Amino acid sequence: MDLMHRTLLTALGALSVVYALVKFSLGYWKRRGILHEKPKFLWGNIKGVVSGKRHAQDALQDIYTAYKGRAPFVGFYACLKPFILALDLKLVHQIIFTDAGHFTSRGLYSNPSGEPLSHNLLQLDGHKWRSLHAKSAEVFTPANMQKLLVRLSQISSRIQRDLGEKSLQTINISELVGAYNTDVMASMAFGLVGQDNVEFAKWTRNYWADFRMWQAYLALEFPLIARLLQYKSYAEPATAYFQKVALSQLQLHRRRDRQPLQTFLQLYSNAEKPLTDIEIAGQAFGFVLAGLGPLNATLAFCLYELARQPEVQDRTRLEINKALEEHGGQVTPECLRELRYTKQVLNETLRLHTPHPFLLRRATKEFEVPGSVFVIAKGNNVLIPTAAIHMDPGIYENPQRFYPERFEEQARRSRPAAAFLPFGDGLRGCIAARFAEQQLLVGLVALLRQHRYAPSAETSIPVEYDNRRLLLMPKSDIKLSVERVDKL
């Protein structure tokens, strides 16, 4: 009886301590006197997100809508972790551009010693990130992007081969654009061709195989413990494959040092400030990590929207074929520069279906919000709700409408720079954004130059997002009717 009594008292004591710690964690914003969304016990303000019943963007959109205009930012909780949600575009501009030196960290988990491929620009912070960023800057130059365009155009010809003479057939658009982007990643990042791409495609589908939202959250909340326990962000067989391929391709490149520049491995290896081989492998993996899913979703969503607006699709195709005709049928830098309306179509897709619904920053030093009494403390995690900004009716009239004219030069200049951030921007923006845009444009040229798309009986309207993903990805594959057409 005494043992049972002591056990019960111990259990109650432990529960009391846990309860007190949870209440203390969820009282952070109240203690600081900061406007905040009242949290629920344990879940904070993201109930249903971890379980996949609700998308993170829905939770952020609700907070943004409820508090915008009341303060420059609002506090909220992701489970027990306090976050700042930036509400005011002036504050967003300061965080991204003018005062980016106060927010040089993303606050993501990385463990280069235990997981070498996490040594990439996306995950690193501090001195390691600054050093790597400086070395990467000379790789992602306009001149190098131009050198890679020829190979990119060659890869896009697969789209035409896959589509062929198809006439009024329903095809899986998600698979089609996924094959193109995977070939780009395999070839441009790793230098793979032919049969090697098949195995590469398999591993690009499997590196998230062991991903669990709650494990990622714990690694974000307790990074030191995660490193001690050797927590892995990605499936080990997949990272072992990517590391092995990158290192073997680097050795192959050095034996063929007269080969024309066609891959990022070569560009990094030939840089004036070279990286170690394992660092180069990390960047190649980061290229896949940051780019493959968002680029697949963007091209699929773009065709989905064009299928629903045939007049916009026809205008885009007309511009593409006119530019190709003026440049001998070749996709050249000059040809891409002439695709002004096509770029507007892509930008409107990125606005309406923003792949990264939020940007993460962590304050590396205290920041006083100008013109207010508010202070963002060192160590505070800041979240910029890009998708909510892109869908704000105060910035974009009738935001649910797909309307490429929003990105005409005059309309674009009338909005603040922070009103459109599909790839992030500023100091910690996507360093490969220029190449990503080039990859999307070249893919869209190949998709539209000889084929027309329309909704079919298998097209899900409206499109739904996958609640299990942090990115805005389609819940199911996008399928459309396709037919070959003559030039308009």
From Swiss-Prot:
User: What's in the GO CC field?
Assistant: endoplasmic reticulum membrane
Which Gene Ontology molecular-function terms are recorded?
A: heme binding; iron ion binding; monooxygenase activity; oxidoreductase activity, acting on paired donors, with incorporation or reduction of molecular oxygen
Q: List the Gene3D superfamilies hit by this protein, alphabetically.
A: Cytochrome P450
What are the binding positions for heme in this chain? C430
Membrane topology, as annotated, equals: Peripheral membrane protein
Keywords of this protein's UniProt record, alphabetized? Endoplasmic reticulum, Heme, Iron, Membrane, Metal-binding, Microsome, Monooxygenase, Oxidoreductase
| TM segment ranges | none
Which superkingdom heads the taxonomic lineage of this protein's source?
Answer: Eukaryota
**Compartments, record wording:** Endoplasmic reticulum membrane; Microsome membrane
Can you name this protein?
Probable cytochrome P450 6u1
Q: Which gene encodes it?
A: Cyp6u1
